[in-house]
Regions:
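N-terminal active-site segment of His-dependent metallophosphoesterases
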Residues: 1-76, 83, 401, 405, ...
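Accessory, non-catalytic peripheral segments of nucleic-acid enzymes
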Residues: 5-6, 45, 271-410
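Divalent metal-coordination and catalytic microenvironments
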Residues: 16, 36, 56, 71, ...
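A short helix->loop->beta-strand "cap" motif at the edges of active sites that frequently abuts
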Residues: 80-86, 187, 244
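Binuclear metal-dependent phosphoesterase catalytic core
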Residues: 122-136, 141, 246-310
Length: 410
């Protein structure tokens, strides 16, 4: 992106840090620390005025102390090395209470947190750099949980739940846009969100939200009053509308092997007067992830070829999908033996052709749609329901909703 205009207020949009994330029992903290160090340098070098994090700061509601240390160290260093504000909303992985607990202390460090949506729409508006002379307004709408959107009732059907959730989301953004209009702001309004926009590309590492994806919304839901909508939840950087006004920044690192080909980035927004000019900054790869699909006959050769690929700053992690093999333990032992001493680490070995998981006969191959479903429990449950011929459609719908509510609580 070109040099910052003299009269611009520069906002950086990022999301889905997932601090404390594990991949096959391996910590991602080394990569996350490198990312946060890099991010801090970009804030200083690019003269960023505000960093906007659109949810999923942490990977769990109760993150490990080491993950909290990464977060608070970044807050402190950002405050020490720059004059930028830090603006954060909670995502579906975050605990709203945990994020907001130190809210008053963080405010003294120019850090503004909204874990739960404010009851009064006017209270969702953050004016930067100051309320007296704002250059941009941030409409802080965090992840909207079911209790924020509808009154749950037993026996509700999927179509009813979907309609109520989508209407609840629409209402939250319309109320916020109306509050911004009532405030008679002379500056652009940037809205935040942590949700699923219908048609956007997902990966295997996103957890179902709004009871199994029932709350996917159309891009047209967001009022035109918002000059830009900074989204989190989906890990692939992408725009969801033709104008590029509604965007996911994506996660800063690949959080699963399904994201290995994603080009990670942060978004830059130069607010000049009433206009918002967009740009992006590519994020370096701190550790390469690689999925090796091979056969028993080609295994040794393919592992040797992998060893020739230059690693990033941290050693490469590999997932091996092996076809033409019948025993996982035996396959795992062979892969471990052949990869010993190589400049990469094999995290996981999977069989590419195994019997169907549910209702399969001997020799039947796995349905391609089942690949990776262990990370998507609601889809596994849906697959199980399809095998139950004695259940009515109404019974299946009720069971599906009950299961997804259970998953949402975990």
């Amino acid at each position: 992106m070109s040099k910052k205009p003299a009269d611009a207020f520069r906002v950086m949009h990022t999301a889905d840090w997932h601090l404390g994330k594990m991949l096959n029992e391996q910590s991602r903290e080394a990569e996350q620390k490198l990312f946060l160090d890099w991010l801090l340098k970009q804030v200083v070098d690019l003269e960023v005025d505000a960093v906007l994090v659109a949810g999923d700061v942490f990977d769990t509601a109760n993150p490990p102390q080491s993950a909290e240390a990464l977060y608070y160290d970044f807050v402190a260093e950002l405050n020490r090395k720059s004059s930028a504000s830090l603006v954060l909303i909670a995502g579906n992985h975050d605990s709203a209470n945990q994020l907001e607990a130190p809210k008053r202390v963080l405010k003294a460090l120019r850090t503004h947190v909204h874990g739960a949506v404010a009851d009064e729409p006017a209270d969702r508006l953050l004016l930067l750099p100051t309320a007296d002379n704002p250059k941009v307004a941030i409409a802080m709408v965090p992840f909207l949980r079911e209790k924020d959107l509808r009154m749950g009732r037993s026996g509700d059907k999927e179509a009813e739940v979907r309609k109520e959730i989508v209407e609840g989301i629409r209402r939250a953004y319309e109320e916020t846009a109306k509050a911004a209009k009532s405030a008679k702001l002379s500056c652009p309004v940037i809205a935040t969100g942590h949700l699923t926009v219908a048609g956007a590309a997902s990966s295997q590492s996103e957890r179902d939200i709004h009871i199994g994806g029932l709350g996917a919304v159309d891009s047209s839901l967001f009022p035109d009053a918002f000059a830009y909508v900074a989204l989190g939840h989906l890990h692939r950087p992408q725009s969801t509308d033709k104008e590029g006004r509604i965007r996911y920044s994506g996660s800063p690192i690949a959080l699963s092997f399904s994201e290995v080909n994603d080009k990670k980035e942060v978004r830059l927004l130069d607010v000049v007067g009433s206009s918002v000019v967009q740009g992006s900054v590519p994020i370096p790869v701190f550790r390469k992830l690689f999925q090796l699909k091979t056969s028993l006959a080609s295994l040794e050769k393919d592992l040797s070829s992998q060893a020739k690929i230059k690693a990033a700053e941290l050693p490469t992690w590999v997932e091996v999908v092996l076809s033409g093999h019948t025993g996982l333990n035996d396959a795992n032992n062979q892969v471990r033996t052949l990869s010993h001493g190589q400049p990469f680490e094999v995290l996981k070995v999977m069989l590419g052709d195994v019997p169907r998981l549910i209702g399969a006969g001997v020799g039947q191959e796995v349905d391609a749609k089942l690949e990776g479903l262990l990370d998507k429990p609601s889809e596994v449950f849906d697959h199980l329901l399809k095998q139950q011929a004695d259940l009515s459609d109404e019974d299946k719908s009720s069971l599906r909703l009950a299961f997804r509510k259970l998953v949402e609580r975990i």
